[in-house]
Amino acid sequence: MDSLAVKSRYYVVYDGAWVIQCDGENSEPYERRSDAFRDAVALAHLDTRNGREADVIVQSKDDLFHPAWDSTRDSYPPPLVPEL
């Protein structure tokens, strides 16, 4: 991959409901973090298929953010959302 290329980052965050954030845009709300994570990885995987690396960062119960899926190391489809 070109060293100047930008990696896509998808954030799964809780703000009254779970949402996916990427490039300043929010998804529709999700009731469950696992559903938002699954869809965030699917979106990140589409970027990967188009030649752009991507990862998914998930907000944990302690409000910290943790990497949960990375196109350079993780398989698709991913396992269930990791417990953070």
Pin down the residues of each PLM region.
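Short aromatic-glycine-(Arg/Gly/Cys) micro-motifs in beta-strand/loop hairpins
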Residues: 2-26
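A short, exposed loop/beta-hairpin motif centered on an aromatic-Gly-Thr core
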Residues: 23-35
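Short, solvent-exposed secondary-structure boundary motifs
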Residues: 1-7, 35, 47
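Secondary-structure boundary/capping motif
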Residues: 19, 39, 66-70
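Short, mixed-charge low-complexity intrinsically disordered segments
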Residues: 49-84
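Acidic, aromatic-enriched beta-alpha/helix-loop junctions
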Residues: 33-51
